Structures are given as structure tokens and as C-alpha cells.
A protein has these predicted regions:
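Non-catalytic, solvent-exposed segments at the cell envelope interface
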Residues: 1-247
Length: 247
């Protein structure tokens, strides 16, 4: 099955409070995935599969991959309708584009939290660029399993945001523009992209938080090793981060 998502990350921005929160879901999370949808975005048929297959069921980047992935994430986070979750926008980028983006901005520095073959040892400060980004964001065997990989993906996004601030949004966007137009897809308008660039320019990185949704190891009837979400933990997380407890 082609077009499976290596990274699925929800970015929630509060423009009033000037905060940003990243929610990651491991790609092996076992969920209900839409197989077909009508033109209004209603699910017609579904199946249980890894969450990273939703993009593929939608036909990938040139069809409705993003639409299916967004709907799958909405339904997963809603816990069968317990919460009203609406994801408005998406940005998807081909893995080759991610490699090139790393070089477009001159690489980014990260501190290794564990040894990763081809990247560095625990405690090392390493520049992530085209030569080692694949190992850094995709390796899991011997490098902290799926959760270790997700943590590194979040660290990479935070390092990119830091580098963009240091470069200045105008220089950074100019450097990345060619790669973005070639490899990325989004339903954000140009004005919205510019607004986000302005937000990042003045954003305090101390207000960027992250969380990884966890699950329990589970083996499917077909023998696949996957994760089943801890629904009580997910419920608590949704209430804490997305709902006003005083309302």
C-alpha cells in the first residue's frame, strides 16, 4: 500500500494566547480508517488499520489523501463522538522534500537523547541535514522504538522553528520556497501562510509544547504488531489541552 504517512502531527495554534501545541500519533496506532467518503466528507465505508494508511486510502497527495487523513485523525481524537474535533487545514510534504528542506535552511542542531546509528550518541549536539535526516526521524529499532522516533520528529520540528526565527522569516521562506512549491501540498491560502510566517517570527518558543498519544502493544488477528490507544489517557489529554476547564 503506497503513500503511507511516516509522520502524523497535529499542530494547534492559539493566536490570542500566542501558544502552539504539537500532538503526535504513532503511525502504528490501530484505528478505524475511512475507505470511502462522499463529497461532503461523510464516511461511507471503513476498516480497522494502522492510522498511517488513511492517506493511502484517500489516494495520496494528488487525490484525497489529506482529506482521509484529517477525517481519520478527527474521528480518532473524538473518541466515538465524545469530543467535537474539527481539523481545518493540512500541510503534507513528500519525504524527499523534507530531506531538501533540511539543506535549504543549512541544517538544524539537535541534542541527541539516545544513540541513533548514522547520527550520533546520547548527549551529542548534531546538525541534522540531508545526509542524516532519514536516520534521525525514521529509525526506531535500537533507537527508542516508535515513541523514540516520534519524540525526535517533534524535536526536529522545534529545531526548524528555532532556525527559522534565527534566520528571519523572510530569508527562511525565500530559502525554502522552491522546495515547498515542488514537494508540499496544503489547503492554506497564501494570505494564511503569510499570517503564519508572521506568527512564527514573533513567537516565543517557550510557548511551544508537545505531546505523544500512547497506546498498548497489541497483535491483530493477522499477526501484525500495532498499538491500541489507552482511551482514558486520551480522554484526560483532550480535556486538559483542548477544553476550558472553567467553562
Amino acid at each position: 500500500m503506497g503513500y503511507r504517512s511516516d509522520v502524523m502531527m497535529l499542530c494547534s495554534i492559539n493566536f490570542d494566547n500566542k501558544t502552539m501545541h504539537l500532538t503526535s500519533v504513532p503511525r502504528d496506532m490501530w484505528v478505524k480508517v475511512p475507505k470511502s467518503m462522499d463529497e461532503n466528507g461523510n464516511v461511507l465505508t471503513s476498516t480497522e488499520q494502522r492510522i498511517n494508511t488513511a492517506y493511502s486510502f484517500g489516494g495520496g497527495p494528488d487525490k484525497d489523501g489529506a482529506k482521509f487523513a484529517m477525517k481519520c485523525m478527527e474521528d480518532f481524537l473524538s473518541l466515538d463522538g465524545m469530543f467535537d474535533v474539527k481539523i481545518d487545514y493540512y500541510v503534507s510534504i513528500d519525504i524527499d522534500g523534507l530531506y531538501k528542506l533540511a539543506d535549504d535552511i543549512g541544517g538544524v542542531e539537535v541534542v541527541m537523547d539516545r544513540y541513533v546509528a548514522g547520527v550520533g550518541n546520547k548527549g551529542d549536539t548534531v546538525t541534522i541535514n540531508k545526509s542524516n535526516i532519514d536516520a534521525y526521524i525514521r529509525t526506531r529499532k535500537g533507537a527508542g522504538d516508535d515513541y523514540g522516533r516520534v519524540s525526535r520528529q517533534q524535536d526536529y520540528i522545534m529545531a526548524v522553528a528555532k532556525k527559522i526565527k534565527a534566520m528571519g522569516t523572510t530569508e527562511a521562506v525565500t530559502s525554502m520556497y522552491g522546495t515547498i512549491t515542488q514537494y508540499a501540498k496544503t489547503n492554506l491560502s497564501l494570505d494564511q501562510c503569510l499570517s503564519l510566517a508572521g506568527f512564527v517570527k514573533d513567537f516565543d518558543l517557550d510557548n511551544l509544547t508537545k505531546y505523544t498519544i500512547t497506546g498498548n502493544g497489541f497483535r491483530t488477528s493477522g499477526g501484525a504488531s500495532v498499538l491500541k490507544v489507552d482511551e482514558e489517557k486520551l480522554k484526560s489529554y483532550m480535556l486538559e489541552y483542548f477544553y476550558d476547564q472553567e467553562a
